[in-house]
């Protein structure tokens, strides 16, 4: 028996013992208190997986009997078993304690009362109370603004009306009863945040309202025609037409006709069974109440007569506001829509549509009211270019503004005239969605509807989303793999505060905005705007969240295929669920990034289903660590690593181990994205193409993206230099360097020390300053712009401190210490001349020193060492030090004369030349060339002032293998 089963079995015995000892039973709250007093701990609800005490006892039908009471409380009584029947009989024979009973009743009253009431609720009958019309109107007014969570209802009601919602004074014992009483206007939806109170759509749009005529002409709402089948036989429903004036009928005759029809209806239903009789009677009573008192049952016929009397005192048209003022002056009674249960004046006037005729005219700021009997309406002439106004009959209460409505007549024909086929002409530019009617619209009206459709001003029409800016090479990012087609075609989403959290905040705001029925109807997309490439939003019915989508293609009359730019997948949705996207929701770039797994390719031509399934299992629904490699045709090639376990799992290594992939040292372009890349098709780049610079690092497959303020000159000719060794076949160390850009292996991103095979190639790389001679005349052929580099901002060597910048370009050359005295004074005019020459050249800037990669190079040039002339290069064989004194190089030649060099301290005679090569198109490329003595040696000396953190993981590993040595400290000699 498991621990949970043992706890549950023990709990069953304890609850049975507690309830058996109580003759009258306990409430759930009393059971919790008694259990705490007896055991000393609370009920183990969470351990057993229950959320409440009632859920626990309902799961014990053989232990607890739930007995509901008439006042709404629940009493829990024990069900004895074979071993406790004797005890239960003894307890049942005990006399009841009146003190305990009174205390229990007080406890029940305190539990049932709301938080705002401390007094005892009087006993009531079994019939639940009716929610007053005023309270219902307040609830509709509150929820008309936006849906409210049940937990926030008290605060929202207090902020709206300045008082707390005291449901106890209306006769309710709990908020649950209030919601049941208001179920015709309020719906409760379960969300992740809790119960969400929303206004029912049927009430908000007034689609289900309709009243039979009570006085004067026979009048019916247009949407009433859809509900003819729901009313009993014998109740005539008039149809609307556009011809013939109305024939007046007296109210007494109509009432008698209704009574006769109801009697005949009762005679017909007497043969039915009892349940059908009750349903028929309920429908009859409902129709009679609606016809006499209106939909809410609060507008009586007496008030209708008073309103009619007030209206008939004026022969001319009367505004709605004047009607209410005159009503108050005549009858000394205020006609308040709130007190009568209506949300606003428009809704109240709509309830009087059988006696009032309402028009809206251009230039008027209010509705005009006429007597429906005294003002016959002319029929609409289709050949005349006159716009008529529709009769406002219970308009939607959620209308954002008073819309321009066409005038129509809903008059009935004479007795001897047959009803012609009804046609309804309505203007299409209503603010809210019009009522769904059985109408016939010709082609001209349809084109007019498309032209005059009212589009919200902040709706997105032709705007495109931006893509995320490219990531730098070697960047470590946290990612979620959102959509997978294959290891060479999948989408990721970056997990960070600037991306994923902003996306979540935007989706929460979209849900809060579009969940309001007013906004949802306002931003509904018409058919003419549903075109491929249009940016909009849609709600997924499964999770009720709103997503940004881009229409990919139209599948039919009802469905479209959309692309989700934040997640990368493609799905099918209904056209009716599409909504215009607000412009404020386009600021966040598309979060999906098309990716391909770096350095892998399938064993065969295409990825197998097992390989795709294995890749999906590796990704899962968890955050991963991604290491950026490069961009190929706009597709990010990235390494993925799972760090959730004790050992890091590299996906490319797993696919290679299981035989699904072949690891290669270059990235193959993705065929899937080459065929279809919706993100590149429907979005735009966040930066201009000239701001993105592609950098080649050693071999053609390595590319790098720099900042926007860097530029590159196009390739002009092939370089005469070549790379050193072949790329190693081993996998790179996915570990980042602690400064600068993240590097994992010096061999994977080697520093390109490009040396020529011939002696003249090496002569380009060295300079000498012995006696002002020019032993290397071939240096004249080197362009000046190839000798310039930008001063780095972050210096990781203390000895490297360049000063005296001229145009931001420096070249470092070291000369023997003996020449230091000749370099004390420098001609400033020559420096100015050199700066002018350098400014004229268009030399791009090299990368920062934090992008300087340390590479362990085993020299294979020992045979070429004889080509150099050691006599011309005065260098100590065991000392290499980076000079802190930069010098200027003449554009014509590289001289070592005192006029061309600026010297402060020279402690080494070795020449270390840092240059830039642009002939091959290699941008900001650094080369570190050693003397022949050091090229033969396999030891690489660096100054001790260099921080160890500047070396990569592989460099630190090489230090332990004696491949890299610190240069011994040598004091500077005084001259």
Curated annotation (Swiss-Prot):
<feature type="domain" description="HTH OST-type 2">
    <location>
        <begin position="127"/>
        <end position="202"/>
    </location>
</feature>
<keyword id="KW-0217">Developmental protein</keyword>
<feature type="region of interest" description="Disordered">
    <location>
        <begin position="820"/>
        <end position="843"/>
    </location>
</feature>
<dbReference type="InterPro" id="IPR050621">
    <property type="entry name" value="Tudor_domain_containing"/>
</dbReference>
<dbReference type="GO" id="GO:0141196">
    <property type="term" value="P:transposable element silencing by piRNA-mediated DNA methylation"/>
</dbReference>
<feature type="domain" description="Tudor">
    <location>
        <begin position="529"/>
        <end position="588"/>
    </location>
</feature>
<feature type="domain" description="HTH OST-type 3">
    <location>
        <begin position="299"/>
        <end position="373"/>
    </location>
</feature>
<keyword id="KW-0744">Spermatogenesis</keyword>
<feature type="compositionally biased region" description="Polar residues">
    <location>
        <begin position="831"/>
        <end position="842"/>
    </location>
</feature>
<comment type="similarity">
    <text>Belongs to the TDRD5 family.</text>
</comment>
<dbReference type="InterPro" id="IPR041966">
    <property type="entry name" value="LOTUS-like"/>
</dbReference>
<feature type="domain" description="HTH OST-type 1">
    <location>
        <begin position="7"/>
        <end position="80"/>
    </location>
</feature>
<dbReference type="GO" id="GO:0071546">
    <property type="term" value="C:pi-body"/>
</dbReference>
<comment type="function">
    <text>Required during spermiogenesis to participate in the repression transposable elements and prevent their mobilization, which is essential for the germline integrity. Probably acts via the piRNA metabolic process, which mediates the repression of transposable elements during meiosis by forming complexes composed of piRNAs and Piwi proteins and govern the methylation and subsequent repression of transposons. Required for chromatoid body (CB) assembly.</text>
</comment>
<dbReference type="Pfam" id="PF12872">
    <property type="entry name" value="OST-HTH"/>
</dbReference>
<dbReference type="InterPro" id="IPR002999">
    <property type="entry name" value="Tudor"/>
</dbReference>
<dbReference type="GO" id="GO:0030719">
    <property type="term" value="P:P granule organization"/>
</dbReference>
<dbReference type="InterPro" id="IPR035437">
    <property type="entry name" value="SNase_OB-fold_sf"/>
</dbReference>
<keyword id="KW-0963">Cytoplasm</keyword>
<dbReference type="InterPro" id="IPR037982">
    <property type="entry name" value="TDRD5_LOTUS_2"/>
</dbReference>
<keyword id="KW-0597">Phosphoprotein</keyword>
<protein>
    <recommendedName>
        <fullName>Tudor domain-containing protein 5</fullName>
    </recommendedName>
</protein>
<dbReference type="InterPro" id="IPR025605">
    <property type="entry name" value="OST-HTH/LOTUS_dom"/>
</dbReference>
<dbReference type="GO" id="GO:0007286">
    <property type="term" value="P:spermatid development"/>
</dbReference>
<feature type="region of interest" description="Disordered">
    <location>
        <begin position="864"/>
        <end position="905"/>
    </location>
</feature>
<feature type="compositionally biased region" description="Polar residues">
    <location>
        <begin position="864"/>
        <end position="894"/>
    </location>
</feature>
<feature type="modified residue" description="Phosphoserine">
    <location>
        <position position="891"/>
    </location>
</feature>
<keyword id="KW-0677">Repeat</keyword>
<dbReference type="GO" id="GO:0033391">
    <property type="term" value="C:chromatoid body"/>
</dbReference>
<dbReference type="Pfam" id="PF00567">
    <property type="entry name" value="TUDOR"/>
</dbReference>
<keyword id="KW-0221">Differentiation</keyword>
